[in-house]
Amino acid sequence: MSSLLQGVNLYLIGMMGAGKTTVGHLLAQELGYGFLDTDNVIAQAAKKSINEIFAEAGEAGFRQIESDVLAQVCSYTKLTVATGGGIVLRRENWSYLHHGLIVWLDVSVDILYARLAADTTRPLLQDDDPKGKLRSLLEQRTPLYSQADLRICVNAEETPEQIANKIMQVIPSVLKQTTAN
């Protein structure tokens, strides 16, 4: 598989709580790739949590830092990259993402809410109606997420290993399509 990918990065996109980091680690191991989580890179570089960055710089400031990190990441190869849920909001980020294969982990609001209900580290969910906020964010972002090279629909029963296997099985067909064009 990694010879078929020829070092091309995999970028995992999708909502917070979709499983990008967990599945990304598994894909990296399977491919012999390195793994990066853009939120972790941002937090380590800033020596602050994502919550603190949001509080100090606002969402716009955070999104700029996120774009700067993505610009640097795309210059590397053989990486599986878990991105922040809102990385698709900035047009410039798509030019970076298109350096690799973009995989959308498509997860329903109900599953996301079940996974995130107790998570207090998500600044965009500090809302009176977190489930409604998730629904609103997903509605806003779905047209953007749908631009991915590969859409993986995730159900509640699937394990991260099953999701990673599903991705590995369909990568060859996506690569054939992109090389044929």
Swiss-Prot record:
Pathway: Metabolic intermediate biosynthesis; chorismate biosynthesis; chorismate from D-erythrose 4-phosphate and phosphoenolpyruvate: step 5/7. GO terms for biological process: amino acid biosynthetic process; aromatic amino acid family biosynthetic process; chorismate biosynthetic process. Belongs to the shikimate kinase family. GO terms for molecular function: ATP binding; magnesium ion binding; shikimate kinase activity. This is Shikimate kinase. It holds the Pfam family SKI. It catalyses: shikimate + ATP = 3-phosphoshikimate + ADP + H(+). One of its GO terms (cellular component) is cytosol. Catalyzes the specific phosphorylation of the 3-hydroxyl group of shikimic acid using ATP as a cosubstrate. The keyword Magnesium applies. Monomer. It comes from the Bacteria. It comes from Trichormus variabilis (strain ATCC 29413 / PCC 7937). The gene is aroK. It is an enzyme of class 2 (transferase). Its EC number is 2.7.1.71. It is found in: Cytoplasm.
